[in-house]
Amino acid sequence: MKITVVCGHGLGTSLMMEMSIKNILKEMGVDASVDHVDLGSAKATQSDIFVGTKDIAEQLVIQAVDGKIVALDNMVDKSAMKIRLSVALVELGAL
């Protein structure tokens, strides 16, 4: 399972979300690779799940990335992040 976190420049926002997602996956006992990229690199990235804020997720839909897209309303709301990741993982049969 590969999860890619996407933000505009692939620096601060996506790195913060990557660390949160790694902690959430560890709590859930899910083994997955988690990386972060900028929006421009997302289309060329192979991933099962792409995670981004709502505006980034809209751009991922437009780019037609090949993977499940998880849109977050608030990048610091870990409980919402866990719920949305759980739904995506269940849909992909990883949970």
Can you name each region flagged by the protein language model?
Residues V34-D35, I49-T53:
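Short, hydrophobic beta-strand segments that form beta-sheet elements in well-ordered domains
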Residues T45-Q46, Q63-D66:
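Short, structured coil segments at secondary-structure junctions
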Residues K68-L95:
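Ser/Thr/Gly-rich flexible loops in soluble cytosolic domains mediating phosphotransfer, phosphorylation
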Residues D38-L39, K54-E58:
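Short, polar loop motifs at secondary-structure junctions
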Residues I21, L25, L60, L89:
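Conserved hydrophobic residues forming the short capping helix/wall of the S-adenosyl-L-methionine
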Residues L15, L60-I62, M81:
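Short glycine-/acidic-enriched loop or helix-start segments at secondary-structure transitions
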Residues V51-D55, D73-M75:
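N-terminal glycine-rich "phosphate-gripper" loop used for MgATP/nucleotide binding
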Residues K2-D38:
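Conserved active-site segments centered on acidic
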